[in-house]
Amino acid sequence: MAAVGSPGSLESAPRIMRLVAECSRSRARAGELRLPHGTVATPVFMPVGTQATMKGITAEQLDSLGCRICLGNTYHLGLRPGPELIQKAHGLHGFMNWPHNLLTDSGGFQMVSLISLSEVTEEGVRFRSPYDGEETLLSPERSVEIQNALGSDIIMQLDDVVSSTVTGPRVEEAMHRSVRWLDRCIAAHKRQDKQNLFAIIQGGLNADLRTTCLKEMTKRDVPGFAIGGLSGGESKEQFWKMVALSTSMLPKDKPRYLMGVGYATDLVVCVALGCDMFDCVYPTRTARFGSALVPTGNLQLKKQQYAKDFSPINPECPCATCQTHSRAFLHTLLHSDNTAALHHLTVHNIAYQLQLLSAARSSILEQRFPDFVRNFMRTMYGDHSLCPAWAIEALASVGITLT
């Protein structure tokens, strides 16, 4: 079945993105998202929560770190506790006691992560609940209905998600279906004045398919666009080229959300390529393995070398963990049954991600972004010859050289 050629019935979408500054050399941009629960400065990293909470950090702590937007998962929230209960709590904001913005995903990612539990048809995605085994259909209409009930500030279309390493007819089928499902999501969206529906660009690693998807989806006047179908095992060279292709064709006056990207180098490179929003479980997941994010990479605090190290994780980090605890203390906690270390590391790792993109934003505003990139790479890798070849190539494609 071919992609639907006529845009959906969405009324003129609100312009939620205000561009504040652009890098004179690369595609990097600094902006503001004007959302129902406040303004969000971009570029921005968005921490990920599954069931109305972040693992290892409270909403109050996220607030204190300066986080102004985070994610919730429609698939999990739709199953447990369910949208009806959350609606009674005045939406997800009230349920979480979160005063700032929320973005909910569509539930489509579980088509990849829970593939053994799902079946995809034109109707939607049929899941078997991992909680009770009950079968449920997540259609584009139901995904939007759940997200309308949750009351998030940004909602995502249901897309047909395939792993980035899949090739062949399934990728084309998924791309065309994602366009058709976008129109169904637009038609089902009942709260256009309060919630901003983003389209998700698909097409895998095939430039022609991704170009077709970009041309089709940008005909729809939605408030923003996500770049989907990446960060799933493809090579970094394939990854950056698809990101660059996407940002080259997306409208400049709308936000660009690169899904599932969280490694520091990836964030900096993709800001240079023109992306505004990022999310990933990486900072919280890596904390649970005793790993702390620092400008030079990661500290594996379980290692014996930190047993008598009384310095903070990062002396320049203002987070509560670095202001209060030493590496030696965290090392000791990690070797006990105490879960406090995971909490302290999560606070620090999220702070690191937020600070990194805040620093990138400041450099864009001050027209020194290329220098920011060079300093970041020098600190992370030492000599520029040790930087990943893909990153050097990607940065060069937008006019930033490291020498």
Curated annotation (Swiss-Prot):
The keyword Phosphoprotein applies. It is found in: Cytoplasm; Mitochondrion outer membrane. Its EC number is 2.4.2.64. Optimum pH is 7.3. InterPro entries: TGT, TGT-like_sf, tRNA_ribo_trans-like. Pfam families: TGT. The modification Phosphoserine is found at S139. GO terms for molecular function: metal ion binding; protein heterodimerization activity; protein homodimerization activity; tRNA-guanosine(34) queuine transglycosylase activity. Zn(2+) binds at C317, C319, C322, H348. Residues 260-266, 284-288 are annotated as: RNA binding. It comes from the Eukaryota. The modification N-acetylalanine is found at A2. Catalytic subunit of the queuine tRNA-ribosyltransferase (TGT) that catalyzes the base-exchange of a guanine (G) residue with queuine (Q) at position 34 (anticodon wobble position) in tRNAs with GU(N) anticodons (tRNA-Asp, -Asn, -His and -Tyr), resulting in the hypermodified nucleoside queuosine (7-(((4,5-cis-dihydroxy-2-cyclopenten-1-yl)amino)methyl)-7-deazaguanosine). Catalysis occurs through a double-displacement mechanism. The nucleophile active site attacks the C1' of nucleotide 34 to detach the guanine base from the RNA, forming a covalent enzyme-RNA intermediate. This is Queuine tRNA-ribosyltransferase catalytic subunit 1. It comes from Rattus norvegicus (Rat). The gene is Qtrt1.
